[in-house]
Each structure stands twice: as C-alpha cells, then as structure tokens.
Amino acid sequence: MESGLAGNGTGAGLVMKVKQEKPERLLQTLAPQAMLVEKDKENIFQQHRGLPPRQTMGRPRALGGQEESGSPRWAPPTEQDAGLAGRAPGSASGPLSPSLSSGEGHFVCLDCGKRFSWWSSLKIHQRTHTGEKPYLCGKCGKSFSQKPNLARHQRHHTGERPFCCPECARRFSQKQHLLKHQKTHSRPATHSCPECERCFRHQVGLRIHQRAHARDRQGSRAGLHELIQDAAARRACRLQPGPPRGRPEWAWLGLCQGWWGQPGARAAVSGPEGPGEPRQFICNECGKSFTWWSSLNIHQRIHTGERPYACPECGRRFSQKPNLTRHLRNHTGERPHPCPHCGRGFRQKQHLLKHLRTHLPGAQAAPCPSCGKSCRSRAALRAHQRAHAVAEPAVPAGEPGDQPQAEAIPGLAARPRSSQRSPGARDTLWGRGQAGLAGPGEPRQFICNECGKSFSWWSALTIHQRIHTGERPYPCPECGRRFSQKPNLTRHRRNHTGERPYLCPACGRGFSQKQHLLKHQRVHRAAPACSPKEEAR
C-alpha cells in the first residue's frame, strides 16, 4: 500500500510503502488526521483493500516498525514523525530529508534484512531472491535483472568500446577493464631482458620477447640446463640452477620417467630440432616433439581417442574445436569463404583454394585428346577420360615391349617410374591386365597384395582392403550393425529415420536409395509403350 504524506518539513516529500491491516491506527501513529486531506485518506484505504490481508513476504516494513504477522507495533513519536506531521498538504515528493538520508535506510528486505533508502533500490534487490530477469537480449536471448547489465552485455554483439585510455588510445567495453588497464601505465618496467636490456612491465611480455631471441640464434644448441630454464620461464617461474622446486628434470619437462632413464634420452632433448626454439614437450607414444604443452595435449588425443567436442545437432564428436566449427557449417549452411571471381561460397578455406585453380589462365580449357571436349578442370578431364577407357575394349597383352603409350594430359606432369622394377611388376603396376579400368592419362599404381586389384588413389585401396581384413569401423548407433564404408552406414540409417531424399518427379514417390528411384522410373518410361497394345485388344 502506498501512502503519500506531504508537509513543510526539512525535506521536499516522502513516499513510503507500508503493509497495514488497519490504516486508521497507522494514521494515528504517524500523523494527526487533521493534517491529512480527504483525498489522501481515500487513496490509502482504496490501495489497502486491493492487497491480501496476510501478504507480507517480499513487502517492506512500516516506518514505525511492524511484525510480519501484520499487527502494528506501537512506537513513541520521534523527531522524524513530528517533521512529517508538520508538512503542508500538496507538497511535491522528493528525496529523503537529511535526517533520514544520513541515517539507516527505512525500506527493509524481509528475506535478508538489508535496508535501502529508496523503494526502487529495494525493488531491484528483491530480484536476487525471486530470480526475476525482465531484461532480455534480442540477439542471444540471455536475460538480466538490471538494465545496465543488459547494456554492457549488448556491447559484445555491437563491438562498441566507449571507454578510451587517454595514454595509448586503447578502447574497452567496460569501465573496470579501463581502470585495470590504466594501472599498467603507472607501473614501472621492472622486467629487463638480459640480452638486449629492454624493459617490460609484465613478465609475460618479457617471455614473448625472449622467444624472438631464441628464434634468432641460428645453429645454437641449448644444453639440458638451458632447456630446463626455458621450460621454467614458460610457466612464469624464476628458476635457480638445479631442478625447479625440487622436482626431477623428467617431470619438469613433461616426460615419462621410464623413457628418461633409457640411454640417449638426455641427448635427444638436449638441443632444438631446428634453428628456432627448442621443442621440449615429447609424446611418450610416438616420440613426436612439440614447442607448446597445449600442442602436445591436443596431439595425445590421437592415441587416447578422446573427443571432448560434441556436435549439438548430430552428436558427432571431435578432438579439436576448429574441426567442430567446420562441421557445424554443414548443419547451418554457412559458407564464409566466397570466391572473389564468381562469388561461389565454400565452407572450408581449402575448398576455396582448390576452386581458385579453375580461374587460373588456361585452367578453363582442358580439351580431351580423344573427343576434343573441353573440361573445366584437370580433375574433370581425368574423370572424363575414364569414361573413354570403360567404353574402349581391353587391349590384349602382347610382347613386353609393346606397352601402349598413355596419352598425356596437357599441363600435367608425368608420374616418375622406377627403373628398378621388373617388366612383370611394371605391367602389373600400370594395369596391363585391367586396361579397361584405368584411364589412359592416369595409371593405377596402388595394388592390393591379396587379390592384385589396382587403384588410382591410396584411400580407395585402404577401403578395399577392409574386404580382406573384415574391418567395419562405422557402427550404427541405433542397432549396432557395423559397416566398412561410411556411405553404407548413411544409407542404412535411413531405415531407422524413415528419410526418403530421392523423389520421383513424375509421381512424387520417395525412395531411400538412388538405385531404387532409377528402377522405379523405368515404370514411367514403359507405360506409354504398353498403351497401344492395350488399345488393340
């Protein structure tokens, strides 16, 4: 209930929120009834009737003190009450009087007992107990309990940086970040480089500067003691001669104790692998070395099989976050890499670089030496020549010297041939027995040791060898059935999901596999041929 009491006291006015069952007794306690106008009384009684009789949780207490049960507690008149009673009716409401503002706040939170001088401050504070967050961000949907917090959050989306450093003109989105940054200008540069005597305010800046010296030292090989010191500097520790903090050398370098005790282990890490910075983080599984501990940590996921980054759409997991970012573009359809020539977008940068080769001079004109057809790229030309190879009959095997010469693709360098191979091995390598399977411009140099089948790509040979080994690395998450190739798993999962991506343009019927659609389309092609016979009958 709101009560407006006006007077000509020291303050301009006072607005109080009071919970009271009997407003008559409250008016007798706070001020004489003769000093109140009838309109103020009607407002008090009307607002009081709208409140439940026992609603006390989350409401402030009265000025004179009131129990949570709702019954008023009598208090003797004070100087503040006398000042309130002496005010003239109709005075404008304003801030608290000096006697109230200088003292303890009179708006009390019934949940934690904290006091406030303003009703608006109490209302904002009560949101911490109720969990109310009425201010919603229109970009990401995050909600806030206070409007200034929403304004600070929206700067992350807009990129606004309204707080500028007067020393270096660097800008910040929040004032506390600016105040923290300004301390760096008043702080003396106490960290000096022992090689060039350059001073830095932070030890982090000194460590980054010292890495530049390490890269400049051409051909220098650091000893074990220098390697340990460099590792200590990376961990922001100052190291005296000897093992750091009493820890053994192998533990400080992140190595295995068993491997460290082997002969030649110290010599393996005693110096850098190249002219740059030494690599002191070594994988215990394969022996590969890294300059950063984070790189070693990511590399070890290859051996442990850890995939901490999961796709929220399909559940597929990845060992590195950039791989997950690239995968998410398959769901969102984002293509952030556009071609500057034709405007075509690509999800990955490597796909864009491969596409840019088609815009190079002469790349658009790749004629086929057999039929003269122009292909857009050399890869398209090789695929086109395979069609010619399948259409042509197989060349019978003749004398060892009658090897047919393959026509060269324009602009494509010939593959080197080893002079140590025997004629029989060379015939097998170049696919003499399977001339109809290999294109005339691209020999098949990857041969299966089990059945002798040849392939043009190493990946195709790897997939083929799963037939002999029985390996099925792609399991179905629904029924557990395993497959040797991922496309087979994709087709199988359509049986669980009911997806039918191949639609017949004639009748609109859907199919889960493309060959089923092609078989179905024969029905529509054969229907007109049967109609004359039916009419003759």
Curated annotation (Swiss-Prot):
Q: Record's SMART domains?
A: ZnF_C2H2
Molecular function (GO) terms for this protein are: DNA-binding transcription factor activity; DNA-binding transcription factor activity, RNA polymerase II-specific; RNA polymerase II cis-regulatory region sequence-specific DNA binding; zinc ion binding
Q: Which residues form a coiled coil?
A: none
- Specify the superkingdom: Eukaryota
Q: Which Pfam families match?
A: zf-C2H2
Crosslink feature (Glycyl lysine isopeptide (Lys-Gly) (interchain with G-Cter in SUMO2)) location: 533
Which keywords are on file for this protein? DNA-binding, Isopeptide bond, Metal-binding, Nucleus, Repeat, Transcription, Transcription regulation, Ubl conjugation, Zinc, Zinc-finger
Q: Which PROSITE patterns match?
A: ZINC_FINGER_C2H2_1, ZINC_FINGER_C2H2_2
Where it sits in the cell: the answer is: Nucleus
| Ranges annotated as C2H2-type zinc finger | 107-129, 135-157, 163-185, 191-213, 281-303, 309-331, 337-359, 366-388, 446-468, 474-496, 502-524
**InterPro entries annotated for this entry?**
Znf_C2H2_sf, Znf_C2H2_type
Which residue intervals are annotated with compositional bias (Low complexity) in the record? 82-98, 388-401
**One Gene Ontology cellular component annotation?**
nucleus
Q: What is its main location?
A: nucleus
Gene3D superfamilies recorded: Classic Zinc Finger
Q: Which region ranges are annotated with the description Disordered?
A: 39-98, 386-437
Q: Which GO BP terms apply?
A: regulation of transcription by RNA polymerase II
Say which family it is in: Belongs to the krueppel C2H2-type zinc-finger protein family.
- Protein name per its UniProtKB record: Zinc finger protein 775
